[in-house]
């Protein structure tokens, strides 16, 4: 489990706890939440644990060694740290499946390590494909690893495609177009501001942007939902996963979040996957595919819901959506720049250094400044370099333009 203390990680471990006959946790990676990590170690007794930060490894070691009696695991895990440590855990010899729940581009290298080791991947970290699709897809084909989408929208598409013929050379989701697939419709809740008028967004606060009406998620992805960048990034991910060009991947606002996405086939029939907005459903399917595991989870009752509604997204309200389409069509290193610039812009917003409305502005400026250096056939090092450049570029922009786009100036 990559990112065990985050939203995806905790829900994945809940599934493992509920289904002990099907799943055994052998490796955990985490950031700095040692209290929760230690509880996870006690409960799941993994063979290896990796910390992203080397400086807190001694503290973890000391705290684990001090455990006594029933609190002490039967065997303490092998402890590693840093990038090398994350890669060791991601490619751990006894793991069959790696669930990638590390937020952002930080999940790229350990995910690649898992792929190179031939592990199947339950992909909840969309940035891996968005930033490095041209690198990841060839590695999947070389290693034979299977990529199973673990986020709700791409899981929905994947589930709908189970009844369609796959080409023999396709290894599940590796960008090879599925015969008969005409169109993908990604559903979006509309995020925290779906019921706000566009002109009212100038009053948007951090609290407003991080309060999602339907889903329980981390702060970063909740802000991405509010800007609709999350859905724009999912368009790029769907392109790499399912092989359709961008003109055949649509976004539709569906406030109830019951239909998680739809596919249209060549005969004009449309298949949809439905369920309550609960991330455990797509995570479980990615973990158990091609099987279905019986659960006691809440069952969907359409009579209880009453109605399902849909409408087109407002591009003036959600400029990030069009930025994502443009970056995807530009291809090469541009999606990596878009992704990194967005991560930095959202971080700056959460730090109260820019206003919500400035998130798309700084992203667009970074993408525009990258056009002259765009690489169409990037290698891994190219992706890493432009990721670093884009983050620095965004911070530099905000520093230079602080008189215009800081929160303090905005309040004046």
Swiss-Prot record:
- What pathway, per the record? Isoprenoid biosynthesis; isopentenyl diphosphate biosynthesis via DXP pathway; isopentenyl diphosphate from 1-deoxy-D-xylulose 5-phosphate: step 1/6
Record key words, sorted: Isoprene biosynthesis, Manganese, Metal-binding, NADP, Oxidoreductase
A GO term (biological process) for this protein?
Answer: isopentenyl diphosphate biosynthetic process, methylerythritol 4-phosphate pathway involved in terpenoid biosynthetic process
Tell me a Gene Ontology molecular-function term this record carries. NADPH binding
Organism domain of life: Bacteria
Task: Tell me what reaction this enzyme catalyses.
Answer: 2-C-methyl-D-erythritol 4-phosphate + NADP(+) = 1-deoxy-D-xylulose 5-phosphate + NADPH + H(+)
Positions contributing to NADPH binding: 5-8, 31-33, 125, 127, 218
Please tell me where 1-deoxy-D-xylulose 5-phosphate binds in this chain: 126, 152-153, 189, 212, 225, 230-231, 234
Q: Where does Mn(2+) bind?
A: 151, 153, 234
- Record's InterPro entries? DXP_reductoisomerase (IPR003821), DXP_reductoisomerase_C (IPR013644), DXP_reductoisomerase_N (IPR013512), DXPR_C (IPR026877), DXPR_C_sf (IPR036169), NAD(P)-bd_dom_sf (IPR036291)
Entry's EC annotation: 1.1.1.267
HAMAP family membership: DXP_reductoisom
| PANTHER family, per the entry | 1-DEOXY-D-XYLULOSE 5-PHOSPHATE REDUCTOISOMERASE (PTHR30525), 1-DEOXY-D-XYLULOSE 5-PHOSPHATE REDUCTOISOMERASE, CHLOROPLASTIC (PTHR30525:SF0)
Summarizing the function annotation, the protein's role is: Catalyzes the NADPH-dependent rearrangement and reduction of 1-deoxy-D-xylulose-5-phosphate (DXP) to 2-C-methyl-D-erythritol 4-phosphate (MEP).
**Per its record, how is this protein called by name?**
1-deoxy-D-xylulose 5-phosphate reductoisomerase
**Gene it is expressed from:** dxr
């Amino acid at each position: 489990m990559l990112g065990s203390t985050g939203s995806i990680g905790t829900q994945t471990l809940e599934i493992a706890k509920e289904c002990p006959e099907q799943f055994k946790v052998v490796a955990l990676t985490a950031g700095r939440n040692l209290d929760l990590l230690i509880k996870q170690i006690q409960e799941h007794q993994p063979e290896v644990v990796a910390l992203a930060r080397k400086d807190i490894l001694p503290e973890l070691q000391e705290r684990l060694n001090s455990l006594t009696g029933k609190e002490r695991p039967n065997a303490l895990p092998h402890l590693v740290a840093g990038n090398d440590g994350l890669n060791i855990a991601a490619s751990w010899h006894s793991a069959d499946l790696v669930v990638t729940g590390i937020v952002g581009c930080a999940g790229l290298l350990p995910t690649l390590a898992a792929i190179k080791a031939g592990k199947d991947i339950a992909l909840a970290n969309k940035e891996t494909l968005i930033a490095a699709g041209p690198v990841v897809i060839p590695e999947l084909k070389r290693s034979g690893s299977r990529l199973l989408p673990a986020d709700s929208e791409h899981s929905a598409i994947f589930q709908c495609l189970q009844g369609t013929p796959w080409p023999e050379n396709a290894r599940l989701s590796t960008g090879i177009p599925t015969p008969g697939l005409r169109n993908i419709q990604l559903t979006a809740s509309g995020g925290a501001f779906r019921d706000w008028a566009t002109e009212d967004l100038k009053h948007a606060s951090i609290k407003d942007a991080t309060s999602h009406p339907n889903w329980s998620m981390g702060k970063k992805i909740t802000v991405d939902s509010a800007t609709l960048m999350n859905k724009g990034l999912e368009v790029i991910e769907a392109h790499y996963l399912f092989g359709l060009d961008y003109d055949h991947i649509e976004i539709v606002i569906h406030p109830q979040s019951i239909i998680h996405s739809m596919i249209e086939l060549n005969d004009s029939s449309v298949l949809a996957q439905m369920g309550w907005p609960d991330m455990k459903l797509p995570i479980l399917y990615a973990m158990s595919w091609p099987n279905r595991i019986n659960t006691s989870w809440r069952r969907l009752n359409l009579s209880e819901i009453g109605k399902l509604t849909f409408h087109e997204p407002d591009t003036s309200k959600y400029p990030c959506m069009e930025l994502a389409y443009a970056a995807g069509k530009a291809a090469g290193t541009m999606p990596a720049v878009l992704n990194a610039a967005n991560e930095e812009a959202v971080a700056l917003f959460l730090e109260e250094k820019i206003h919500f409305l400035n998130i798309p502005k700084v992203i667009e400026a970074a993408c525009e400044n990258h056009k002259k250096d765009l690489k169409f056939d990037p290698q891994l090092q190219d992706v890493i370099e432009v990721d670093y450049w884009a983050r620095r570029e965004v911070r530099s922009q905000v520093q230079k333009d602080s008189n215009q786009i800081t929160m303090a100036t905005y309040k004046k």
